[in-house]
From Swiss-Prot:
Protein name according to UniProt: Transcriptional activator protein acu-15
Lineage per the UniProt record: Eukaryota, Fungi, Dikarya, Ascomycota, Pezizomycotina
Keyword annotations from UniProtKB, A to Z: Activator, DNA-binding, Metal-binding, Nucleus, Transcription, Transcription regulation, Zinc
UniProt biased composition (Basic and acidic residues): 119-129
Cell location: Nucleus
Pfam family, one: Zn_clus
Originating organism: Neurospora crassa (strain ATCC 24698 / 74-OR23-1A / CBS 708.71 / DSM 1257 / FGSC 987)
Cellular component terms per the entry's GO annotation: nucleus
Compositional bias per record (Low complexity), positions renumbered to this chain: 623-632, 669-681, 740-792
GO biological process: DNA-templated transcription; positive regulation of transcription by RNA polymerase II
This protein's encoding gene: acu-15
Compositionally biased residues, Polar residues: 689-703, 726-736
Any one GO molecular function term: sequence-specific DNA binding
Domain notes: The glutamine-rich domain might function in activating gene expression.
Amino acid sequence: MPGILPMKVIKVGNSSQSRIAQACDRCRSKKIRCDGIRPCCSQCANVGFECKTSDKLSRRAFPRGYTESLEERVRALEAEIRELKDLLDEKDEKLDMLSKMHSNRSRSAEPPRSTPAAEIKRDSGTPAKEDTFRVQASPLLLGVENSDSYFMGASSGRSFIETFKRKIQENGKSCTDFNPEAFLHIQGCYPLSTKLAPQSMRIPPRLFSDRCVNVYFQEWAPLFPVLHKPAFLRVYEEFVADPEKIKNNHKLTQLYLVFSIAGLSSEQPDFQQLAACETQWHKSLEAVLMDNTMLTLQCLILALMYCTVRADYKRLQYYKGIAVGLSHRLGLHQSQKRFSFGALTIETRKKVFWTLYTLDCFSAAILGLPKLLKDEDVHAEFPSDTDDENVTEKGFQPSLPGEPTRISSALALFRGSRILGKVLEKIYPAATSYELSLQQMSSLEGELTEWFENLPQHLKLNFKQDKPSTDVTGSRSPLLALAYYYTRILIYRPAIASSLGPKAAPALMSVAESSKSIVQIVQLLEERSMSFSFCLNKADILIVCGMALLYQTLGLKHDSKVLKDNEKLVNSVVKIVTKVNAPGSYDFKRIAGMLVTVEESLPQSLPTPPRQSPEACMPTPPAQQGSPSPSAVDRGAQPNLARQSSASLSETDLIVQRDKLLGMAVTPQHQQYQHQQLQQQHKNELSRARSQTSFDNLRQKAQQMRPHHRHSLSHAQVAQAALMGRTSTGTQSTPNLDYLSLSSPQSPVSPVQMRSQPHQLQQQQQQQPQPQQQQQQHQRSSIASSHSQQGQMFPQKTSTGMSTAEWEALVRSLDGGPVSLYTAIYGGPALAPLETPSSATQSSATAWGQDPWDMSSFNLGDFVPGAPTAQSVLSLSEESISSCDDVPSSDMGLNNGNMDYRNTLLPVTSAGTNNFLLDGLHGYGL
């Protein structure tokens, strides 16, 4: 009935279709759709039939997909509840700590009741005496112990590291290996490359330079708008067209500094190329340091950015002093309204100055030194919220309404830097001894929090469940949040280990929470593959944050939720700083292991059977990387070829060839087994011969295959090398894999050489069916004659890489099936080689024949019509070792009859594969 809700409606999976949980009896018996309206469904109402629903179903009331979706939702909710429970436990633990401290503090500060209200009234500007503490500047000087020693103040984190060391000693732990000078690049920065950059790297590759320019203007320029993008791109176009024509030192300095900054912040920097770029901009910058121009100041600011990321603090202070003096000389600190410049010049001057101010504040905090730009001297206005493309000398061009600009992130950072400047002046003055109060710190934190909360929505990083949200599309919002937490750490860090005692616990909690957020932000940037494009050294700030987290764990119980959370974060810090090979990473890991459980890196597991190719488990020899291989064909792309006897070397062929070459006696049981295998092979050959038609497409397909014939190591060579490692003695030399073994008949022959034998063997089987002994003798004589012909046509190189006994052990392992071969190659009991025949001799020297290119015995008439054609003939050219597919049979006047090789041609392999074909051995684990 209309207006009456139906029964329970369920949805199947994620689709839009829905149905009721159970149909009525009539609809179910007639197998028609029931809408489930109660008390009577539409189908029953149309015919006037009583609608009844009886619960006689033997099947499930709900579909399986619906139940599984409910189970998945339950699991997700359980996981979310566990996270929230851990988070609440952590918050409760912190609240308990704060409530205990607040209760003790209120009781001690409670005034007597008899005191009049007028007498207990305090001046709001005067902090309580018990909230004030005195800070004594550290007398530590770093470097050599003479007048050349240099100073690092408390804002650098050096004093906190000393405090952390004392705290560990107070807890009864040994600190003999704790060297504070191992951190913060106190010993200086390492050179980018120990090798001298070649002259060819003076001009970077186009791919490298394009990527660096793109990264710089996407990641760095929005926060540090020191360059005018259109003007720089015009210079870059000139550089790309002809690098030798760029002679201007300002242009060269800007170009190579952009390459260096962007390249250094990439995930895997090319240090040798960066060293070449660093050499170029050093030379160009030194040539223009005395020029009092805006271009020189822009170059100096770029150098400051590079030195900050590079942690080259010596050059940083040197370049900053010149840059600040030059900005004063150019009048950038003054109000720009006083000057009659064009709009583009005015905006450029504002952007350059405030970028310099930001770098001055952060570099002063890093080095622990006073700022060089004093706030009372700064009267410059902030730049307008307009991007470079919309600013000209004549004025501003309209932009899209409601669309956020790129420079908006820089404006937010400039305002945050003003607060950082106040923090440095009030919390870290240059005085030797000064007083600080918790009220003063809270006031600065309030101003900082107001700035952070008033950020535009596209620049605000939201935290969900105490973790940064992952719905970010760029690095600007995470980096602005990083600046906020870094400044918050600087505000509260002096209170740690001060004379406040337990009253400093809120400050420690603020520092630890901010350190936790910074580590999470760096993790977010790495997970999203975004650059750490900020004026801080990532390793230094992570190590200081990790020490703050370790400092907090010293006062926690072993089952504390906060301690477990800090342990995870410290392990993340260890992984990141170890990956970038930062100075002090090993010392930090050792110190962290004293306080928390540090996860050790998992050792590399032993090699396992390869699923696709052994190259994934075995490194390629250096000499083999550039040489082609005649059988370099992707095995995975040709599954049918392994099952065709004419296109692969079967086990029987290997046995016959082995018996011929090694002169071994064949037992009757062995001969009977060979005869059965030959009969089966003969049947397969006859069935395939009926479908053979022509050889027309061989040249075209071979040319398609030829570009993919360059690989590193064939399956036969991998098996041979693996067996050598288990069966050879200590006096035997390592097999030379730089060439394919073309051994003489006295030496063992690899499976690659024997690929041309099956066709001759199979033709003899088709034409001359003989008794067992005669057939085998005829095959052996045919193989011997073919080898003698090959020896005449192609002189063979003697190989000493593998002894006869070892090759015999490998071939004999084929009789045991895949398990035996796997054991021979990947481990297990060593294969016992058979008795070495007298014909197998080892030679300690490799030598070619006296006349290796003698073709006197070669005759084209030998290639008569109907003669079997070898599947692959090796070229003995020194330039390449590849199949002779370059010369088709038609060009040599050869007639292959009606033989059709279309179904046996190798398919074109992918260019990125390094797999090889070992014919006939796919079933044996290779």
